[in-house]
Amino acid sequence: MIVKEERAEMDATSKDAPKRLKLTMEFAGGHLTRAEQHTGRGDYEAASAEVGMYHALIENALEFLSTFKRDSNKTRDLYKRLEMALRADGPRLTAMRRITPLEFAVWIKQVEDFARDGRTEALNSFYGHTVVHDPEKVEKPIPTPTPKSNNQP
């Protein structure tokens, strides 16, 4: 869930992709900071809500970037900016998850995995066209020996 004021501000900058991404990442970072503060105070419900808003903003940023042409240098720069932000957020999410009770930590772990997958997507977008992937290995069936008959001398 993205807050109405944040969505309005992001929509106002939708023509300028770098500015919109920077704004989105600032909002996401703010929610993550507030989640850390709530976690430190033991207010895990509010921390979960802030982590959910962080998740929504990262998801929105990935959807926004997916509309651009992947081979463009500008698009790769945007993905790199997103990847760097997500790289910094990973340890913060992990630290919160470790001090959070299990019933709330499950959701933080889910967002942590989502952020890791988002970072992977950003890296794949950045390097995807230059990486040579190994071909898939096809396993050959193991031949079964034919049993010998006892009728032979």
Give short role names for the model-derived ranges:
Residues 1-153:
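Long, charged/polar, soluble alpha-helical segments
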